[in-house]
Amino acid sequence: RQFTSDRKEKAARNYLQKLSEADYTGKRILVVDDNELNREIAVEILQMTGAEVETAENGKAAVEKVEVSPKGLYDLVFMDIQMPVMNGYEATAAIRSLPGEKGKLPIVAMTANAFAEDVQLAKNTGMNGHIAKPLDMNKLNDVLESWL
C-alpha cells in the first residue's frame, strides 16, 4: 500500500510541477463560486503560482467587489455559472457594463457545465474563456498563461 501511495504522490507532484513553476506574483485573481470547498481548492491551487487570490460567494458579491475596487486591482476572474443570488452570466453582463477597464476585465467560466454549447454560451455572454470542473491543471495553466 505504501508503494501505491508513494507512486500516487509522485504523479500528483509531477502533475502540479508546471503550474507551481509559473510565477504570477503581483497578479490578483477573483474566484467566484457559491461552493465553499470549490473556492478553497481554487485558492490553494492558484496561490501555488504566487498570485493573490480573493473570493466571492456569488455573482452579486463579485460585481460589488469589482465595482468598488481600485482601477486595475483584478487581473482575472474565474466565474462559476450556477450560483444563487446572481448567476455567472448575469454577473458577467453586469461587469461588462462597468465603465473603463473594469468592464474589460478578463472573465473565464469555471464550471461543471462543460458541453460545447456551454462553452459557446459563456463566450456569447461576454466571457473570455471556459474551463471545466474538476480542474485540469494543464488547461488551468494554459488559461493563466493566456490572460496573465
Where are these regions (language model features)?
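Active-site beta3 strand of CheY-like receiver
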Residues: 71-78
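C-terminal catalytic ATP-binding subdomain
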Residues: 1-18, 49, 141-148
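Active-site residues of response regulator receiver
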Residues: 80, 111
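A Lys-centered signature of the CheY-like receiver
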Residues: 133
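Charged docking surfaces used in two-component/phosphorelay signaling
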Residues: 40-48
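Helix N-cap/capping motif at the beta->alpha junctions
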Residues: 55-68, 88-91
